[in-house]
Amino acid sequence: MQSIFLPVLNPTTIDGQEITEEWIKKYGPTLRGKPVNIDHNYYSNGNLAVGDVVDVYFNPEGNLYAHIRIFDEIYWRLVDNGIKIKGVSFEFNDDGVGEEGIMKGLALCLESDPKVDFARLVEGNYVLEVLASIKRDSMDTKTQEKTEPKKIKDMTEEEFEKFLHEKIEQILASHKKENEDKDKSDNEDDKVVEILASKMDELVAVNKSVLKQLEEIRKAQKEILASAPVPPSGSGNSGHRRANLGL
């Protein structure tokens, strides 16, 4: 859970009286552990908690603050979508039942109207989540998209180099793991791994050079083909000429 400190936006009792330090000392402890809900100006269909109260207190400047905890799922969805929390508001019992006028929780006041549902029941437990206009950043969707791997022939020189590095590292890691599972009497296998690792950059450089040469060969072939005279119509040598050029 995310622990945060927020100003109390309505520091008055249910009767509209200003809340004093003496009042907080007397009634503040009754608020500890009680739920933090979304302000009913935004969500009026229930009191599904999005967190709980740690404490309320006056700071040295005489301003009333609340220390609350918010469930990670709620907090990060608000942050990801740029919805700011202005502060909290006291919620009092006002139904004439029980301790009327005593604080029953805090309302989280937002700078926009989320129009959301806050919980769903799964296997007997409430799983908190924010829906509707509050959604996770589109980056989440992008990271879940699956793309087909590029074929080697379509890779750039840099992509091929990275691909080669990854493949060699996978082979070396697999080789080392196999050796770790064996009861070795000497260090010969480890030496092989060290030698292969030391040659990795050299192997990449060689393959990089080969790739570059292949690109130059393809370019030269295209230039030769482009400058070659066009054979007479109906000639049977066209396919032969192209075959000799490797195209």
From Swiss-Prot:
Ranges for region Disordered:
225-247
Query: What is the protein named?
Result: Uncharacterized protein MJ0335
Q: What species is this protein from?
A: Methanocaldococcus jannaschii (strain ATCC 43067 / DSM 2661 / JAL-1 / JCM 10045 / NBRC 100440) (Methanococcus jannaschii)
